[in-house]
Amino acid sequence: MLNNIDALMIYNSPDIVDEREWGFYLGYFAKGTKETDANNCMIVEMRTIGNITTKKYAHGENASFLYTWSERENYEYDFPLKNI
């Protein structure tokens, strides 16, 4: 399984990391906002299955700060809708 340092190397400096038994949630907040604000976060779910790591985004939105960090477990995660 990836550790925090590996996750940071894959994604440039997330604002917050939530490590779970199965992987990580990484949060990126819109400039000038914080963890407790609503609808300001891009959330990435990283899971390691064997030697493969998947990177999925809340509803596949990989360039939008539409989500709330405290609701991260309630979103569906999918592969990116567009390349950035």
Model-derived segments and their meaning:
Residues 2-84:
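Intrinsically disordered, compositionally biased low-complexity regions
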